[in-house]
Amino acid sequence: MKGRILYIVILLLFAACSSDAASFVKPTQPEAQTPKSSASSSAQTEAPVKLKIHVNDTAFTATLEENSSAKAFAEFLTQGDMTLDMHDYGSFEKVADLPRSFPRNDKQIDTDAGDIILYQGNSVTIYYDKNSWNFTRLARIDNVNKKRLQQILGKGNVKATFSVE
């Protein structure tokens, strides 16, 4: 008798589990058919926001990263160009204090020549060599190599003007 009751309980459990599984499948099917893919397709075809950076007589463009720090930085620049006195630090970057703080998305990264980095939320750096630390990458300068960037940034202080295209 106990065996039959156990057998019936097991059958009921299997039946309950299989009906739950079916109820979970049904709601996900319509979601998969929603037109979200067209929205993401249009987002993928949008051109990325570009920064313009002028150092001495040279103009660069830089592609913004996709993070809240880069978005806040670009939004700030829509109010007008920002010119900073940048000084050399460690023979691998130019750094300047920002007029305000920005949100941080720090993570361990390896920088390379052309990286524009937010440091501690209130400084911006242009890297012309490598470094590794917890940083927030704001952008990368397009089509520039280490040697060319070192020539343009040179030794000592430079004035850099940041704007959005």
Q: What is the predicted role of each segment?
A:
Residues 140-165:
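Well-ordered alpha/beta subsegment
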Residues 23-50:
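N-terminal, intrinsically disordered, polar/charged segments of Gram-positive cell-envelope systems
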Residues 48-90:
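N-terminal secretory signal peptides
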Residues 72-120:
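Mature extracytoplasmic domains of secretory-pathway proteins
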Residues 2-10:
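Sec-dependent signal peptide recognition
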Residues 46-48, 68, 112, 121, ...:
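Extracytoplasmic
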Residues 128-143:
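Short, compositionally biased
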Residues 15-16:
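C-terminal motif of bacterial Sec signal peptides marking the signal peptidase cleavage site
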